UniProtKB/Swiss-Prot annotation:
Gene Ontology terms describing biological process: DNA damage response; double-strand break repair via alternative nonhomologous end joining; interstrand cross-link repair; positive regulation of isotype switching; protein-DNA covalent cross-linking repair; proteolysis; somatic hypermutation of immunoglobulin genes
Keyword DNA-binding part of the UniProt annotation: yes
Protein name as catalogued: Abasic site processing protein HMCES
Biological source species: Mus musculus
Domain notes: The N-terminal catalytic Cys-2 residue forms a thiazolidine linkage to a ring-opened DNA abasic site. Glu-127 catalyzes reversal of the thiazolidine linkage; self-reversal is favoured by duplex DNA formation. Glu-127 is also involved in sensing abasic sites in single-stranded DNA (ssDNA). His-209 stabilizes the abasic sites by forming a hydrogen bond with the O4' hydroxyl group.
Record lineage: Eukaryota, Metazoa, Chordata, Craniata, Vertebrata
Modified residues (Phosphoserine): 160, 294, 321
E.C. no: 4.-.-.-, 3.4.-.-
Site, as annotated: Required for sensing abasic sites: 127
Assembly and oligomerization: Interacts (via PIP-box motif) with PCNA.
Amino acid sequence: MCGRTSCHLPREVLTRACAYQDRQGRRRLPQWRDPDKYCPSYNKSPQSSSPVLLSRLHFEKDADSSDRIIIPMRWGLVPSWFKESDPSKLQFNTTNCRSDTIMEKQSFKVPLGKGRRCVVLADGFYEWQRCQGTNQRQPYFIYFPQIKTEKSGGNDASDSSDNKEKVWDNWRLLTMAGIFDCWEAPGGECLYSYSIITVDSCRGLSDIHSRMPAILDGEEAVSKWLDFGEVATQEALKLIHPIDNITFHPVSPVVNNSRNNTPECLAPADLLVKKEPKANGSSQRMMQWLATKSPKKEVPDSPKKDASGLPQWSSQFLQKSPLPAKRGATSSFLDRWLKQEKEDEPMAKKPNS
């Protein structure tokens, strides 16, 4: 299953991370709908709002079905046929949608038949592993392996500054397949909401949980899932299956409480360290990077700050783990990522909203 995610990037940075090629091969950025409803967070739970990619054709009849927009949607699909005046009165859970019953339940079958396919965006998602012999559960943060890419431009004068701006060379967002619907409230306002499709876990995650989100790995998979005008439902459903191209690390139990919204939620934790260590040099640099990517605001449950102004972490970079977490290229990427200073300054702009 998938019941908690992180999506902390400011709006303008998130937009750059979603750059894509249109049918003519031009590099483009998706446009926003209801941008003010987007709230970055390290700890998103059901019924909160998350950014979702979908085809522009859902809103503009003359649009190309391959064109994309981003819209914040409520997590937990509210069917269009729901009769109550309050969506919180929905009696069944629509946070996730099992791939094996997607064509059996009206809540999902109807919007899927209308082509209401979307891609849920996140840094990654959290999952909890039950510790043997205890009632405790260890949280993990799960995401795409991160590989540093070359920036565009080089010595090619034909590359405009606009195209360079549309090339993303940092954290790769997790792209999860979803279904959305539009419920019309008694007052006439439409509520857009979604459900994340889940599949059996891949081998690498099966020790943590038996289910995982249906992850769309690569631009082609994302394009086919979104383009309901060209790709039929049955063809699109072939994209829904477990993938192995993921990595993970344990994180602090601070993420257990959905009210906690700090960088510590996704910071790697050392399971062998019982004593709370102070932030080391690498973790401080990661904290500084994360701080530039999200709007600054005071959170009641934020950890206390030391003299340097940085929160004291109860975690540090993963050294050993009882599970075979994939490190390799991702570890190398993170090492280089942490050393970035001035290269990241252009991406540290605050959102316009």
